[in-house]
């Protein structure tokens, strides 16, 4: 049974383009070592219609029986990641293949390759992602996507207790750091041995491009700073967003808000999220156009959306960045007590934005500039046109 499972897993790697045929024996021996097995007799078994989840379960059950791992979701996830890494190409090969495809066939072909690799390597556990609940709802603001994420494995009580008592480590500093690539993981940090990162340059600095293992939508990607540095919404944020969009114009890219009171992000590490998907907000129409003095070449308007959104469009992304920075600076310090908008209370700032960038035809687009306060886009549209600004 063990030898059949190993042969099937190696064949899966070959079929999916992870493992070259010439490395069949080499990969088989790597898996034998993982399973603490010295002997191997090539079994006669059906190698058609291999289901990865089933093969991994067979190997994990055997690893539990042999005392190699404990029988828990956490230990199984750590170990099957180790198994899958034996099939995967080294990081340099992935980078070289990505860049070659990008140069010869364009960005869409390159991201297609990388996304398929991330799924085939089981970094994205597609059989778990399928468990997520997804449906749409027609509203006055368009057809909204509603999802419930069920793909993150639940921690069992033993794993929770073990994580509490485990020795604390600061390596990697967080789950977004470059140092996660190839990391074996531990009881309180996921294994990332089958994880691969594409290095990119944005705003003249080193960043990483990867996919989210939980893919909330198609080609859900994460773009993160090569250094462990905090998130901050500023002019450089817009530059980084559009540098990425120029590299991958078929993707959108956005930043979560940089205030703890807003929540929903790892604020300790500068990063963005994006993907190849069209959300309802992108389709939402402009309900009121306006012009900002000095930026007449930038199209601006309020988006029909339940939250406060301003949409900016321009063929020259530098002009768009200039206006976005102007809006951000004014909004940070804007207070309107009658509208219950306060720049800060007790020294804690309240006003920030959630910028999302994309390319729409010949135009660069920043959509939205979403505030944390109600009716803010209308207020901004008015105050931006004041002569004293």
From Swiss-Prot:
Reaction(s) catalysed by this chain's protein: alpha-D-galactose 1-phosphate + UDP-alpha-D-glucose = alpha-D-glucose 1-phosphate + UDP-alpha-D-galactose
EC numbers for this chain: 2.7.7.12
Gene Ontology biological-process entries = galactose metabolic process
- Which one Pfam family would you cite for this protein? GalP_UDP_transf
What's in the keyword line of the UniProt record? Answer: Carbohydrate metabolism, Cytoplasm, Galactose metabolism, Nucleotidyltransferase, Transferase
Where is the protein situated, by its record's location annotation? Cytoplasm
Q: List the molecular function annotations (GO) for this entry.
A: UDP-glucose:hexose-1-phosphate uridylyltransferase activity
Q: Identify the metabolic or biological route this protein is part of.
A: Carbohydrate metabolism; galactose metabolism
PROSITE patterns hit by this protein: GAL_P_UDP_TRANSF_II
User: One GO cellular component from the entry?
Assistant: cytoplasm
Check the record and name the HAMAP family matching this protein: GalP_UDP_trans
Family classification: Belongs to the galactose-1-phosphate uridylyltransferase type 2 family.
Q: Under which name does UniProt file this protein?
A: Galactose-1-phosphate uridylyltransferase
- Please name the taxonomic classification of the source: Bacteria, Bacillati, Bacillota, Clostridia, Lachnospirales
């Amino acid at each position: 049974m063990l030898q059949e499972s190993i042969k099937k897993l190696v064949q899966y790697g070959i079929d999916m383009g992870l493992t070259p045929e010439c490395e069949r024996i080499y990969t088989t021996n790597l898996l034998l070592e993982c399973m603490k097995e010295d002997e191997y007799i090539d079994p006669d078994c059906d190698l058609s219609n291999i289901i990865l989840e089933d093969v991994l379960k067979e190997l994990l059950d055997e690893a539990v029986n042999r005392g190699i791992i404990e029988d828990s979701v956490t230990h199984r996830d750590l170990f099957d990641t180790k198994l899958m890494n034996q099939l995967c190409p080294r990081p340099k090969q992935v980078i070289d293949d990505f860049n070659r495809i990008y140069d010869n066939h364009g960005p869409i072909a390159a991201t297609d390759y990388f996304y398929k690799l991330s799924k085939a390597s089981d970094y994205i556990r597609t059989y778990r992602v399928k468990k997520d609940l997804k449906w749409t709802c027609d509203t006055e603001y368009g057809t909204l996507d509603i999802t419930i994420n069920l793909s993150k494995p639940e921690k069992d009580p033993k794993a929770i207790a073990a994580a509490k008592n485990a020795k604390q480590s600061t390596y990697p500093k967080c789950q977004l750091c470059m140092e996660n690539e190839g990391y074996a993981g531990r009881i309180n940090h996921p294994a990332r041995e089958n994880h691969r990162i594409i290095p990119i340059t944005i705003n003249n600095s080193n960043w990483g491009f990867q996919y989210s293992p939980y893919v909330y939508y198609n080609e859900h990607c994460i773009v993160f700073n090569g250094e462990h540095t905090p998130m901050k919404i500023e002019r450089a944020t817009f530059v980084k967003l559009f540098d990425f969009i120029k590299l991958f114009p078929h993707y959108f890219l956005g930043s979560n808000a940089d205030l703890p009171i807003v929540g929903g992000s790892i604020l300790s590490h500068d990063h963005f999220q994006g993907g190849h998907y069209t959300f309802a907000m992108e389709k939402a129409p402009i309900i009121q156009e306006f012009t900002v003095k000095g930026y007449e070449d930038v199209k601006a308007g309020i988006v029909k959306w339940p939250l406060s959104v301003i949409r900016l469009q321009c063929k020259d992304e530098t002009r768009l960045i200039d206006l976005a920075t102007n809006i951000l600076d004014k909004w940070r310090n804007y207070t309107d007590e009658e509208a219950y908008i306060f720049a800060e209370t007790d020294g804690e700032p309240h006003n920030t934005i959630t910028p999302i960038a994309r390319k729409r035809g010949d135009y660069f687009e920043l959509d939205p500039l979403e505030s944390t306060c109600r009716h803010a886009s209308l207020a901004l549209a008015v105050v931006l046109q004041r002569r004293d600004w």
